[in-house]
Amino acid sequence: MVMAATRGEVAWPTIADRVRLAGGVMSQREGHAVAANFGSAATELAICVKRVGLAVRSDLDALEIAGAEPWLAHFLEESLGGRAPAAGEAVRTARSWCCRVAPDRAVVIGPWSAAARWAGIVRHAVLTGAAIDFIDRSDSATALTLVGPRAARLLDDAGLEPDLPVGGVRESWFAGSSALVLREAADRFLLVLDAEYAVDAWQELLDVGRVLGLSMVGAEALERLAAAPGRIF
């Protein structure tokens, strides 16, 4: 087993190790290993529809963009076609979410290729004089999806307040890590945590969610769910 994450002198399993040990059948998405399923995509889809599923989103990358409020607002307006999200809001664009977590900070979460495009846009803006900067969070952040009719209750039980509107985002604290919480849909949440504490967060969600029927789900179940009538992802 690869023990890539370390705290002091002690080596800890990574979230990828835990996914494999949990039975994840791995496949490639944009050159990155992703859990396609945990035995049956059909069963996992039913879990997402009837209970609550937890997915480790190694198919997603994160990019943090920072700058004084006027500069960041102008950059986001230009990049998003006219309206920058207010603090606490997220905008869905080109398979990604642009989350304004503070007046001077935004986090973009999306597929690796989309995050790379955003990084290119930021670099171009900096070269043309914009007073903004970015941090590539590909090695320091982990994204988790909770989806299903019991997802909000699970977050509430875990101490992560789920009372956000769809498209609402807030920063919180969970399992020793700062945590971005985004409500993607009425029954779907995206969490972005420090990678160093991703295993702790994953385990805590599993422990809290056991009484709610929480199970691991893979990318195939999420893709099937997105293809259902009335769903956008």
Model-derived regions, located:
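Basic, glycine/lysine-rich polyanion-binding surfaces/domains
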Residues: 1-233
